[in-house]
């Protein structure tokens, strides 16, 4: 597992949601800069997209685990 994923797993869900929002805003700014020809480091967009995907995956795993635990508790 990558160190980025390990760091993200240590954070709680609210922090992960904030990170996703911040990264999406950063990605949007980078896209505008690229469209205007101002962006220098376009490879960072790939890294940002991957980090967003990792964070959303962790959030989804937590939601599914919570639903599963609630379902088992109701049996």
From Swiss-Prot:
The alphabetized UniProt keywords are: Ribonucleoprotein, Ribosomal protein
Q: Which InterPro entries match?
A: Ribosomal_protein_uL29, Ribosomal_uL29, Ribosomal_uL29_CS, Ribosomal_uL29_sf
Membrane-spanning intervals of the chain: none
Q: Which GO biological process annotations does it have?
A: translation
Keyword Transmembrane helix in record: no
Molecular function GO labels: structural constituent of ribosome
The cross-references to SUPFAM superfamilies, in alphabetical order and at most eight, read:
Ribosomal protein L29 (L29p) (SSF46561)
Q: Return the GO cellular component terms, semicolon-separated.
A: cytosolic large ribosomal subunit
The UniProt entry's sequence similarity note says: Belongs to the universal ribosomal protein uL29 family.
PANTHER family for this protein: 60S RIBOSOMAL PROTEIN L35/50S RIBOSOMAL PROTEIN L29, LARGE RIBOSOMAL SUBUNIT PROTEIN UL29C
Protein name per UniProt:
Large ribosomal subunit protein uL29
Provide the organism lineage as a comma list: Bacteria, Bacillati, Mycoplasmatota, Mycoplasmoidales, Mycoplasmoidaceae
Gene of this entry: rpmC
